Amino acid sequence: TFVSSQVSGPR
């Protein structure tokens, strides 16, 4: 989901 990308992005 887009949430995974949002979390994995900055992390």
From Swiss-Prot:
Tissue: Nacreous layer of shell.
Protein name: Uncharacterized protein IMPP7
Organism: Nautilus macromphalus
Superkingdom, natural source: Eukaryota
